Each structure stands twice: as structure tokens, then as C-alpha cells.
Amino acid sequence: MMPPPPNAWNELMWAREYPLAFFEMSFLLPHFLKEGRGKLALYFSRVYNPVWTNPDGLSWIEALTDESKVERHACLTPTWSETAWFADYVLPMGHASERHDLMSQETHAARWIGFRQPVLRLALERQGKKFNFTYEAHREAGLGEVWEEDEFWIELSWRVDPDGSMGIRRYFESPYRPGEKLRIDEYYRWIFENSVPGLPQAAASEGLTPLDYMRKYGAFLVENDVYELHRKVLKPEELQGSTVDPVTQVVKKNGAPIGIQVDGNAVAGFPTPSRKLEFYSKTLKDWRWPEHTIPGYIKSHVHRDNIDAAKGEMLLLPTFRLPTLIHTRSGNAKWLYEISHKNPVWLHPQDALRLGVVTGDLVRVQTAIGYFVDRVWATEGMRPGIIACSHHLGRWRLKEDFGGERWSTALVDLKQVDPGKWMMRTIHGIQPFESDDPDSSRIHWEDAGVHQNLTFPVQPDPISGQHCWHQKVTVSKASAEDRYGDVFVDTNLAHEEYRRWLQLTRAAPGPQNLRRPLWMIRVYRPAPEAFYLPGK
């Protein structure tokens, strides 16, 4: 059922400037497109809200609304998001109880899987009703056409390749009914029968199929007391086609290390090129970072030596979380928003005195690409010279009565005042409204917070590629023209900041003309030949 690894490399996801990045460089996509590195015929944002969550969200808006960069944008989301405003298609997807899905978490030293199921579909089917798709059950139950994602991709693949001539459809055909469209129950039946060790035997002991077992219990313990994985002996099938380096004893397969010989046994070792715990990293030396081959202190962009207090510069910590909210996914939780709906700027009293502000006053926080206006909370919980503003808050919508639930969003005016220069101003905050939930008329708070992430430039670490969230800012008392919730961003400056950070990188190729070390894992790993740059 799985297609072979692709023999192509997508540089819009895995740019050659970041050969050691663990994940794709998705937050840089608007800047890659702006540079002309490519264009997208269709972009799917899947349960992803880059306009709000990512840094530099206005550059995302510019890219998503420019058909020379993104021809079409489909937003797959279980809840409305700021990104959905700038989509050609908004496709409602099911929450955890509205879809089939597999999940696991780091709860204890064990390997286990959980099986989510669309409860309304199952309930209606137990009443004798039949459905071809989960969205049909949701429509029957009054939810509307809410799809589950697995069925969407199956159906889309058959629509794109109806006769199979493109070679796509065959990966979405039933393993039990050759040539027929894969059904959602068959998809999970095959997984449970073929790729979950021990599940078929456990199910058989109760007279159940693996699928029925998971439908009954919803979870399965694959392996308990999982410790010392580096000592795990490799199986004969894992060793097939492998070679052993006579000097290092590293076991390699398809050019990548999979284990190491210890006392005559091939064991998994650690996920490094040497399969040992590495104090010295030959990879960093080979990829032209010799100064970081052993652990050491790296002076960051917000190190105190890089903060000029005489100019009013401070360090902003924008990443601390509230225990009540989750990114932009908890806006519908009315009780949680009743508890937490503000994200003031935490400021030490010494800094408040220097700025001439007290708790509740407005300050302007200036970043490299813009500013936001927020209220002050003076507290000795902060260190002088450092401010903090919590995540989660600052949700917004562009229309009064639709496009974002009203429990958590402020109505805003967003406009481009000059090319690349964007201004957002709050029209009004959260207000009571009439709905089938009587609590909506009892809303007693107005504050929706301030969207600070819009004002952050992308700051990709030159080695790992991960975004460096901490910001060097200048804080001042708000002017007479400033209003609470104001956000201003210059995307021209944002692109200049991107270029400045890009110049810090040391791009591929590496040894043997590689785009990326062969030993490093990555999602949707291409064929080995795709790792090599053309030429030479």
C-alpha cells in the first residue's frame, strides 16, 4: 500500500541552506516564494494556522493572496482560524471524536497506540444505518459535512486519477477487494493486522479480529518496560543487505548506519553516525561547523552583550504558556477563555518606573519589523531588562458575524497602508452574543489579548534551522495615537531580516555532494539518490 520513496527533492521544504535541519523549513515558505524559488499550484494547510502561530504572519498573508506564488490554497481545519480567511477552500475536518485516527503519547516507559473513532457514525451504525463516508453520518446527525481526513485523501486520489493511469490510485485501493476503492474500515483493518506487533494474537485470544479488538478497547500495549533500546539486538531481516565497517564496527544499510557490533552482536546503538553517544560530532565538522563539534556555549542573538540597555533595548520572552490554553485550538472552550483572556506585558517595577508606566498603562513594543501595543503588568516576577508576553491570546476575525468563533476573537480592521506596510486595529473586543448556548449572552469580559507573533521576524538558527523565538525589542510608553491591540508590520523589513539570518548559514553540498547527511532521519524520506545534488 505504501508508494516507493520519491526520487525528487523539494527545496521549498528542505532548503539547501539548512542541510542539518531536523524538520522541514515550513515557516520560511513565504520568503522562499518571494525569492522566486518556486510556486505552488495548490497548498494544503492541514490543522495549521501559520498566519497566527508562525512568526511574520503578514508575509504569509501576502503569499497566500498572491496567485503568482500560491495559485490555490485549501485550509483543512477542525476549527476556523486566521489562516482560513485567506484560503480559496475551507474544508471542515473532524475533531478527535469525529474521525478515525491513531495516536500515542509519552506517558510511561512503554510503546502503545490509541485508536480514535467517530462516535456519531459508530452510534448510528449500531442503530442499523449504513454510511459510505463519515461526513454522511455527521450530516445525518446535524453536524454538516464534516469530513474525516483519511477519507478525504482517499476520495481526492481517486478523483485525481480515476482510471489509475497516473499511478496514484493503486495506493488507495482495497487490499481485500482488488481494484476497488479503499474503505476506511479496511485501511485500519490492514494496519491492525499487519503492523502492530502482538495485536492479532491478543485479538484472537478473545475471539475478535484486530479491528474489532481496537474498536472495543480503543488502545493496545505493544511493549512494556521499554528501556535500554541501544542494547536491542537487530533482527536478521533488519540486517539483510547490511555491511559492517571493520574499523568502527558500525552496521550500515543503504548508506545509513542502523547499528553497531558489540561483543559479536549487532545492536541498535544510539541514533548517531557512530551509533554511540557522541561528545565529538564528526557530522558538524564535515558540514563546515568545526567550532561546534563538541558541546559549548553559543552566544545567542539576545545575549546580554547584544542588548544595548542605553538605547532602551530589552529582551522579550514571547513563548511562555498558560496552563489553560493551547495555541489557537482552545478558542471554543468558553470556561477556559473566561479564566484566561489577557496577555499583558510583564515588566519589572524598575523598568516600569524608568518608562513612567504602571500596571494597566499602554506600552509600545518595537521589534525589528514592527510593533504591538499592549497593557503593562508590573511584577517583581520578571528580571530587570526582560519582558514577557504569553502565547495563545490575540485571536481576531475580520467580519462581525462569521469567520471565527466569538468566544475568543476580537473584531479587527486589517489593511495595507503602503506596499508591504500593514496596520491592524481592534474595532471591538469580545462581546456577549445570542446563540443556542445561553452562556454566550453572559460573557462578561471584553479583552481578547494582543497578537504579538505578527511582529516577529523569522529567525532561523543557522545550524538547526529552528526558529529562535526570543526577540530583541525596544519598549516605550504608548503615544496618544496608539490604541490597545494595535499591530504594525513592514514585510519589506521582514524579508530583509530573513536575508540577514540566511547569510549566517553554511549551505549544502556537504561531503560527496550531499544535500543532507544520509544518516539523519526525516519524514517522507526520499530515495538515497535524491540526497545528492546534481553535477560533480
Regions found by a protein language model. Give the residues of each.
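Post-signal/leader-peptide non-cytosolic segments of secretory proteins
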Residues: 114-117, 128
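Long, contiguous, secondary-structure-rich segments that constitute the structural scaffold
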Residues: 121-204, 330-346, 350-536
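A conserved C-terminal secondary-structure "cap"
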Residues: 192-227
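Extended redox/cofactor-interaction regions of prokaryotic respiratory oxidoreductases
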Residues: 1-86, 94-101, 108-113, 213-355
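Alpha-helix capping and helix-loop boundary segments enriched in small/acidic/polar residues
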Residues: 31, 74, 104, 140-147
